[in-house]
Curated annotation (Swiss-Prot):
The keyword Cell membrane does not apply. It comes from Haloarcula marismortui (strain ATCC 43049 / DSM 3752 / JCM 8966 / VKM B-1809). The lineage of its organism: Archaea, Methanobacteriati, Methanobacteriota, Stenosarchaea group, Halobacteria. GO terms for molecular function: RNA binding. Residues 54-130 are annotated as: Disordered. Residues 7-74 form the NAC-A/B domain. CDD domains: UBA_AeNAC. This is Nascent polypeptide-associated complex protein. SMART domains: NAC. It comes from the Archaea. GO terms for biological process: protein transport.
Amino acid sequence: MFGGGGGMNPRKMKQMMEQMGIDMEDIDAQEVIIRTPDEELVFDDAEVQLMEAQGQKTYQVVGEPESRELGSGEGSAAAEGDSDESDSSSGVDEDDVELVAMRAGVDEDTAREALEANDGDLADAVDELE
């Protein structure tokens, strides 16, 4: 992007980036976790940089990750908690039930029934109850 840049003065490089509207910032991260469908990549003491250009933020993580299967380690409690979010008999998310109940001013059982009747569509459930 900057034509080699191998011998470029870091101060000059920073000045050029500022002129182009690119802002970089180091983030003091203790741990970075990237969760994929199959595993977690855990970076301890990773170097993290935030680069903001044209209103878009990009995070760069540098370090050696430790790979662990989902469901092991610290993240497993959060992952198991997510599975309890939906009611096993209806498949309706509890957060959705609470939101519909609050918006429509009804109890959670009524909100759950409305969500089930509307295939989980929040707007239709609220409209039906109002």
